[in-house]
């Protein structure tokens, strides 16, 4: 059977969630190919944290170098590994744009090499690219469409792959309606992506004033934050604190109980996007063009676009409330 290798240099859950629709679409289109995923951090999330998404077709490569592509020594080490394991891929797809990583990745024997690095210099075969999509995944999708004479279709994750136990749990945790999700914690601590606490409180109080129920999507480790919110918003709901289930599939199931969600750029945003529910996504130091989910109804607030600044604090509660009102009109 033929083989496709997808190289993903990101190490977070959000980085992995973002490529799911591409993985599914490749699997459906290239039915005579096996799909292999090479993650630079070797965390194999589809074998553990994301196992319940039931994407069982994804295979792990014999390339086990930690931080693959990020170390110059890999340029020399990959040769002996390739020879020892007789490694060859019909198609290699590069989902990052660092020159060093791409040069090392391209040393793996292949027929077709798809990469946007250095203005698509490493593409094999060569072809002209007119669409300059900023989101690298959708840039790659455009490349594949050209290769397949526009027959390649990007599909969405089917949440019916998730076991019923998660949806049953979501029904218990959120048994009514008029819920609005709020996600305000960030995984990457190197760039400030979190809104000020008082902004969150103002937004929550506004939601209550229009008969909505604020649902905080916060992991149990953030119990101090939960207590702080509860001291200000007595009717706040924290479903994850009332469940023994700790799995991203529960978040996706909870999302289907929400009218919409308000979130910063974090892993939860990408998890919720698999449910394809309406969303207000708030960006500060990160690029909304690169990282905003492609879902049916998303309202993007970017401080870079609105104020030419990476300061997320410039996106005030009043600005967010405008988007809330817009979603209310659209969803009612």
Task: Name each model-derived stretch.
Residues 197-285:
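Donor-binding and catalytic core of enzymes assembling or modifying cell-surface/extracellular glycoconjugates
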Residues 115-119, 130, 270-332:
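Nucleotide-sugar donor-binding patch of glycosyltransferase catalytic domains
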Residues 1-12, 182:
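Nucleotide-activated donor-dependent transferases that construct or modify glycoconjugates
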Residues 16-28, 42-49, 53, 203:
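Short amphipathic alpha-helix
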Residues 161-217, 221-227:
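Core catalytic architecture of nucleotide-activated donor-dependent transferases building glycoconjugates
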Residues 58-159, 179-186, 190, 197, ...:
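Conserved nucleotide-diphosphate donor binding/catalytic pocket of glycan-assembly enzymes
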